[in-house]
């Protein structure tokens, strides 16, 4: 039995929730997010809170209810406060710049890398070696950050590459003669 699913998701003022079968739409000041939930989950909206429980006939009902609760809580936080993800570029000549609706990266390749940003995600570069991603969809921000990091992952000898701001890169010792 899921302990996560037992806690209700409190809906703050200024947030609209629409339940249409298993499709839930949440609107707030930062935009609108929609998610389709698993059929094993039953969602009820009452007293500015969403409560979750399993449907009869499903073995994994409580597990799916806990997952649904965590996802919808992230959606509520996203449309009210939003999410940010910071990336750092470590290496000589590694630079980032915002070019329209894309992030331009100079990562030591023979060509510059342009990564388009999906709708709902904004990026800014406080310095040439920092990228800050902002948006309402937690999953989409994480995916864009992972895509940017995948162009040049931190290598284990000098630590050069694109890394998350809170990431600790374990470095190896060089080969001894």
UniProtKB/Swiss-Prot annotation:
Gene3D superfamilies: Ribosomal protein L6, alpha-beta domain (3.90.930.12). InterPro entries: Ribosomal_uL6-like, Ribosomal_uL6-like_a/b-dom_sf, Ribosomal_uL6_a/b-dom, Ribosomal_uL6_bac-type, Ribosomal_uL6_CS. Signal peptide: none annotated. Keywords: Ribonucleoprotein, Ribosomal protein, RNA-binding, rRNA-binding. GO terms for molecular function: rRNA binding; structural constituent of ribosome. One of its GO terms (cellular component) is cytosolic large ribosomal subunit. GO terms for biological process: cytoplasmic translation. This protein binds to the 23S rRNA, and is important in its secondary structure. It is located near the subunit interface in the base of the L7/L12 stalk, and near the tRNA binding site of the peptidyltransferase center. Belongs to the universal ribosomal protein uL6 family. Part of the 50S ribosomal subunit. This is Large ribosomal subunit protein uL6. The lineage of its organism: Bacteria, Pseudomonadati, Pseudomonadota, Gammaproteobacteria, Enterobacterales. The gene is rplF.
């Amino acid at each position: 039995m899921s302990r996560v699913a037992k806690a209700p998701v409190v809906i703050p003022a200024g947030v609209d929730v629409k339940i249409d079968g298993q499709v839930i739409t949440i609107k707030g000041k930062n935009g609108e997010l929609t998610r389709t939930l698993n059929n094993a989950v039953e969602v009820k909206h009452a007293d500015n809170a969403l409560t979750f429980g399993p449907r009869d006939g499903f073995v994994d009902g409580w597990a799916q209810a806990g997952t649904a609760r965590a996802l919808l809580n992230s959606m509520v936080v996203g449309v009210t406060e939003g999410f940010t993800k910071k990336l750092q570029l470590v290496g000589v000549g590694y630079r980032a710049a915002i070019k329209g609706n894309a992030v331009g990266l100079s990562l030591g390749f023979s060509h510059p890398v342009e990564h388009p940003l999906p709708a709902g995600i904004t990026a800014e570069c406080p310095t040439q070696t920092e990228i800050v991603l902002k948006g309402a969809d937690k999953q989409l921000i994480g995916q864009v950050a992972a895509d940017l990091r995948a162009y040049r992952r931190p290598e284990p000898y000098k630590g050069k590459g694109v890394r998350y701001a809170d990431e600790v890169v374990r470095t190896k010792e060089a080969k001894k003669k």
